[in-house]
Every structure is written in C-alpha cells, then in structure tokens.
Amino acid sequence: MLVHQAGILILQGLSGAVFGILLFYLLGSLLTRRWIRIDLYQLLLSMAVAFLIAIVCEVYLGKLYQLLTGKPLWQYRVWPIHDGYTSVLNFIVWPVYGYYCYVLHHILHARQISIRPAWLKGLVSGFDGPLLEILANGFFLLFYGTFYFYYLPDDMRHFTSIQVVPLYMVMGVILTLVLDYLRERPRRWHYPAGFYLAGVGFVLAG
C-alpha cells in the first residue's frame, strides 16, 4: 500500500515536472524566436546544482525564519520531510527550477543581456521564485486538489508570500555564483552527478 501511494505521488511530481519543462522551453523559444538548442552537460549541471542548493536553502532558511519570528513561513503538504520544510518529491521538482535557470541564461545570452556583477542576477530569484511557486501550487490544486506547499501568511492567498522574497534572493545569489564558477570549469560529469546525489542524500536524511 505504501509503495503504491509513493508511486502515485512520484507520478504526480513527474507530471508537474514535464509540464514545467515544456512550458519553459516553449516560452524560451518564443522569446528567442528560435528553438533552444540544449547543451546536455550545461543543462544537467544547472538542474543538479539548483536541486542541491535549493533544497538545502529552503530547509535551513525556513528554520532561520522560524527562529527569528517564532512560526514557520510555509509547510509542505505533499510527502513532507525535514519538519515540513521540503518534500521528497523535490528530487523531481527542484531540478526543474534549474531547467528554468538554464533557459533564462540562454535567453539573456541570445539577447546579449549581461547582468554584472554576477550576484545581481541572483537577486532576480526574489521575484521569479514566488511567481513559479504560484504556478506549482496552481498546477497541484488544479489536477490533484491540494496545495503542494502551503504558506501560513495569507497575503498571496497561501500560494506564496511576499515574505519569502528575501529568502529567494539569498538562495538565488548562492546558486548564481556557484553555477557561474562551475560553467567556467573544465567539463567533468562528476559535477552534475555529485550535486544531484548529494541532494538525494539530503532528501533521504529527512
């Protein structure tokens, strides 16, 4: 029974991931006016690094928020772990954020838009992160009748919250700096493999 339920939840996560990947690819191709050509190494690197950094940041920044305010900012509703600060399904979902970052990087490069210093680009996550959360929660509510995660403040109808913006900025700066560093390193497949496996280990530790 537990295996069956886990299988259903994993399929739900995969459906959301496929939806996000298709949406971001089509929007990116539309904005660049040509089909985006995928560099498999750079794509997998972006997805793996985003997975590890995002899942660690959401747990520890979430705990820091609770330490400072006395209450949590969000709680996962689907397969929660690490005291509800993240979900087992994020081994599927968070890499899609890395896919989004890859597409965004491609769009900026195609349009010859350079944001410097590099950390400034990371601050963008403070604005696009909450929008993507609304998309994720909207998908789960529409197709599965539940919030994927639930924000306790009701300033954004519990889909996300303005209060999460600075947390996304911190995570975005870390992610941008790490990715920029690794993109300039010689290609080594142990980078994406290592980051992804470390993220899976963090999930299993929850």
Identify the residue ranges that each predicted region occupies.
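Aromatic-rich, lipid-facing transmembrane alpha helices and their immediate juxtamembrane interface loops
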Residues: 1-206
